């Protein structure tokens, strides 16, 4: 499904340079096809804002080549911003009220770095709640990544995340628990997904509220779950969108904080991430005591095997295909005629 460059955005230019198909508005308007309008609520901090745009744009644009995608990127108040990044947002991001007026077929919520143990204390909490409530009544499906899943589960179901003894950080194996779910059709029954989080929500917490767990791992716990109907809200506790170097950059960031005395101990290596040669390289660097300016990031990036990308593409392709099947032809209406909003996949009445 090609992306449509309906607004000027640096991330689209980067993807075009990488060889991804990007349609201009003139060419897109000549194709007699129902486009999909996907909202991307980007809550990520400044350092990861643009990279997160590209990660989700790649997954959307690579899903298939039938429909057209207009991706509407927006954010909400409450996330600390530098003056330069706020200027970028003001120039390139869209306004939620305008999007709510025009309508969206689906929304992706990114994660972010929380500042408080209780998510309700975050400055962006009431603004995110407003988007959740609107989407619940107007959007075919909402897909949440990592911290966004915790926000949604606390808002809709009163489920509070729990602090882990240590950070879950690395790439972990998972197993599909519900092979009949259409989002999991024709994908590997066991696959990898990156995780990077201090907190989690357990299968027991979800099942107690009637929320089906779709994918889970022995080390990582729940990777994917959904709202009781199976589709209106999709929750990932991991990061299927991550690039090859995402965990590497997080490790470098935390190592720099440790060297600056802002963390009490050095970060642990991401689990199941580096090749044996990469693990030796990074241990040699740490033992040498060299400054962060000498961190061998480029060399380490070559020592990462990407084991999650194909499954991530398949998951997003299945999700977007279902959105395309279920959404109304008018973008401001939630479902096509005959679809039960309480059971859009028709699984509950079987």
From Swiss-Prot:
Its main location: cytoplasm. The lineage of its organism: Bacteria, Pseudomonadati, Pseudomonadota, Gammaproteobacteria, Cardiobacteriales. Its EC number is 2.3.1.46. One of its GO terms (molecular function) is homoserine O-acetyltransferase activity. Pathway: Amino-acid biosynthesis; L-methionine biosynthesis via de novo pathway; O-succinyl-L-homoserine from L-homoserine: step 1/1. One of its GO terms (biological process) is methionine biosynthetic process. It comes from Cardiobacterium hominis (strain ATCC 15826 / DSM 8339 / NCTC 10426 / 6573). Substrate binds at residues 167, 196, 253. SUPFAM superfamilies: Class I glutamine amidotransferase-like. GO terms for cellular component: cytoplasm. The record marks 113, 147 as: Important for acyl-CoA specificity. It comes from the Bacteria. The gene is metAS. PANTHER family: HOMOSERINE O-SUCCINYLTRANSFERASE. This is Homoserine O-succinyltransferase. Transfers a succinyl group from succinyl-CoA to L-homoserine, forming succinyl-L-homoserine.
